[in-house]
Amino acid sequence: MNKIIIFILFLISILQSVRGFTDTDEIVVLYLEAPLFFSKFGTLLANVNAFHSGLGFYSLNSNETYQVDFVAVPGVLESILPNKIENGEIIWNTSGKVQFSDSIDNTGYWSSEKEIMTINNEIFETFLCWAQNYNESLSYYQLFDVLNRNTNELLVKSVVCNDFVWAGFNALYNLGGKYINDSIIASRDIVTLYTRESIEYVQDGSTNIEVISFYEAMLNISIPKNQTINGLIEELDELFKGNFYLYVNGDYYNVTLDSSPFSFAYSESPLPIGERDLSNITLLESCHFQHSSDNDIILNNKNGIGGWIFIIILLSFTTVYLVGGILINKFKNEKSGLDLIPNKDSWSSLGGLISDGFGFIKSKATGSTSGGNGYSSI
């Protein structure tokens, strides 16, 4: 019997080690940056500070860490160029996706980690719900801001990793996040196309002859190995005589480019300050945290997963123990009837332990205990 209790306690200790943040954790929010390396993009991004960014979270009370970022799927280039043109229609294969990982990548991918603010577990859980709503609202990747140089009016807003991060800062601040200090600053990339006119929405753009001709020419452009993004935009501007058709989440816009049509800036960007306003935070009516091994979208109910792992291991152990013990008692010890049950007297007193054990498992699997720390479902 003592061996059974020791084994159960061992399994409980394993279950406790795969937990999430607790209600008492103080959590630090990190601004993560990773350079877009020359080895991948060549000189296309030469002379620019091009970074991928994300948000990291770590507990000051434990070794728990999390990472959330927004990426172009399958890549940034696919958000600019269509997959193909077939039967008189432009076909795209592009989307934007919020990724969640239950650890911060420590392989050296992130070149910079800056502490921004502290939050608690309640804010973290609400943020995860907000992140899913963000991705349902903005499920595409749009590289460019489009700005009217005459009026300084933003005509099209980019939807990139930095936009997600700054929207995340805004959500966390309005939910009650506290800055590490009053002098926190952070910088980001901003890619801008300039026009001096209003942009024109193109009706039925995917089958529009002029739009198709534009993207056929785009697909046929051979980018030299030493081409920079500035040079590429200038080449496109000359090729298309200032008319640029921009694809944005199923829609097309005719953008008449300015004489200096492009800029790539890496500069300080303001963080949210002032009065907090929860009306800025849009959440889904219900949230379910669903972990995916390929980081498919959001979120990980680690307590629930741990609970079911515990159940499976415990039932497997019990089955093997009973079947093995019965076989040994029957064929080696030549017992019969109820005496076949291994440690029969000990098992008869196990009812209370089983009841308590299932109560514990239920609390871990459902997060139903009062004051528990199971994630709200997203």
UniProtKB/Swiss-Prot annotation:
Keyword Kinase among record annotations: no
Keywords: Glycoprotein, Membrane, Signal, Transmembrane, Transmembrane helix
Signal peptide: 1-20
GO process annotations (BP): lysosome organization
Keyword Acetylation: no
Subcellular localization: Membrane
Positions bearing carbohydrate: 63, 93, 135, 181, 220, 226, 254, 280
Family matches, as InterPro entries: Autophagy-rel_prot_27, CLN5
GO cellular component: lysosomal membrane
Chain ranges passing through the membrane: 308-328
Topology relative to the membrane: Single-pass membrane protein
Pfam families per the UniProt record, alphabetical: ATG27, CLN5
One MF annotation (Gene Ontology) recorded for this entry: hydrolase activity, acting on glycosyl bonds
UniProt similarity note: Belongs to the CLN5 family.
PANTHER family on file: CEROID-LIPOFUSCINOSIS, NEURONAL 5 (PTHR15380), CLN5-LIKE PROTEIN 1-RELATED (PTHR15380:SF1)
Protein name: Cln5-like protein 1
Gene that encodes the chain: cln5la
